[in-house]
A protein has these predicted regions:
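A structural preference for long, well-packed, hydrophobic secondary-structure segments
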Residues: 1-3, 208
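A fold-wide structural signal in alpha/beta-hydrolase
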Residues: 3-5, 123
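Structured loop/turn residues at beta-strand edges in well-structured enzyme cores
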Residues: 35, 143, 175
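Core catalytic region of metal-dependent phosphoesterases/phosphodiesterases
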Residues: 2, 10, 14-114
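Residue-level detector of flexible, active-site-proximal loop/helix-junction positions
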Residues: 11, 82, 114-116, 131, ...
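Conserved catalytic scaffold of divalent metal-dependent phosphoesterases
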Residues: 83-172
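Conserved beta-sheet core of the metallophosphoesterase superfamily
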Residues: 154-155, 160-207, 212-215, 219
Length: 219
């Protein structure tokens, strides 16, 4: 069974707080390496301000970070609403040109909706926000592990202020998939399922930062 690091909503600014990003990125890379992850999945919103304010500093930081991650494991990415202009999809997004110029064979960006095998018997089922017309062709494959990948609000999700969202999809949208890798809403919460208790020691809690690693969960 492959071990996958699921990361989303990085929101790299044009100029601000880059020192903080570098510090966290280094810690994250070390965790991925120490835990010997097989794949790294980035679930969108790499950039923060859509198509405005793209700077040389942002390009430099993203290039360094993606190269660093890809030296640990293959990196698979989708776009988020902050990475593009959803009202004008003819415009280029804030990530694709950088990935294309890097020409790194260990980095994969999925802009088209579809089913993509990334590991023997394991599929990304991509519901791309830049290719909603293609959603209808995305179906889980029999006798495979299918991971639904989507960046956007799910109905019933709540923001950090407690506001309940009416998303474009509901939890039932993912009912035929083995897993769902989601992005967009930054608040940790449970949707359409009972809460899963994860037991950790007090010492481990002291080391909690902005992400966590769950080895295995049984219900």
């Amino acid at each position: 069974m492959p071990k996958i690091a699921h990361i989303s909503d990085i929101h790299i600014r044009s100029l601000k707080r880059h020192d903080e990003y570098i510090d966290i990125f280094k810690k994250l890379s070390k965790d991925c390496a120490d835990n010997k992850v097989d794949y790294i999945f980035l679930g969108g919103d790499i950039f923060h301000t859509k198509l405005t304010g793209i700077s040389p500093e942002y390009i430099e930081l993203l290039t360094w970070w993606l190269n660093d991650l890809s030296s640990i494991a293959p990196v698979h990415m989708i776009l988020g609403n902050h990475d593009l202009n959803e009202s004008n999809l003819s415009r280029q997004d804030a990530v694709s040109p950088i990935v294309s110029a890097m020409n790194n064979s260990n980095i994969f960006l999925y802009k088209k909706s579809g089913v993509y095998e990334f590991h023997p018997g394991w599929n990304w089922c991509i519901f791309s926000i830049s290719d909603k017309e293609g959603w209808k062709s995305v179906k889980p494959m029999k006798n495979k592990i299918n991971i639904a990948c989507y960046h956007g609000p799910v109905s019933g999700a709540r923001t950090e202020t407690g506001y309940e969202l009416e998303g474009e999809v509901t939890t039932s949208f993912f009912k035929d998939y083995d897993y769902a890798f989601l992005g967009d809403i930054h608040t940790f919460q449970f949707l359409g399922t009972k809460e899963i208790e994860i037991v950790v020691s007090e010492e481990e809690l002291k080391n909690y930062s902005n992400y966590e690693i769950i080895e295995e969960v049984s219900q």
